[in-house]
Amino acid sequence: IEAAHGRAPAVATGVKRSNPENIVFTYQGDGDLASIGMAHTVHAAARNENITVIFINNAIYGMTGGQMAPTSLPGQITQTSPYGRDVNHCGYPIRVCEMLSQLEGPEYLARVTVNNVKNVKNAKKAIKKAFENQVNGKGFSLVEVLSSCPTNWGLTPKKALEWIDEKMIPYYPLGVYKDRSLQGKED
């Protein structure tokens, strides 16, 4: 099923509630989820809807020409911020996992990346956990994947992978931001 831009969590909620046995997930970019779809994402998380959200954060509107996204980094140059994102004018980037972790509803929130083999393995584990949570009826899971956009970043693919390490991860730290299955357990 294809949903209107930003509305995937609302559509996924309807599909899951009407067909609870189905595995339902959304695959959304940062322009979709963190901009026009933010309200739908927040409320699905707050209600702990039993869906899985895969959120691709490449810090740019990659499919429409490279405009500044809600997740573009401070100082990041884009088509609509040719001198770099000015936080005094455009505000700060939205850290989705950190924001959603303040809600009581979500079952699982994690941020991963896919810029090397080790990180791909960790991403697979996080995505598997998110789908297992849904299968087991535990509720809302979101996995944010820091991803490259070499074309719109104006970088080679190799440099784009390095940019994730050098620029994105310091601003968007990797890790599990919420896992209710671990609450109350000692490490």
Report the location of each language-model feature.
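Conserved thiamine diphosphate
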Residues: 21, 69-136
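Flexible, low-complexity linker and terminal segments
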Residues: 135-187
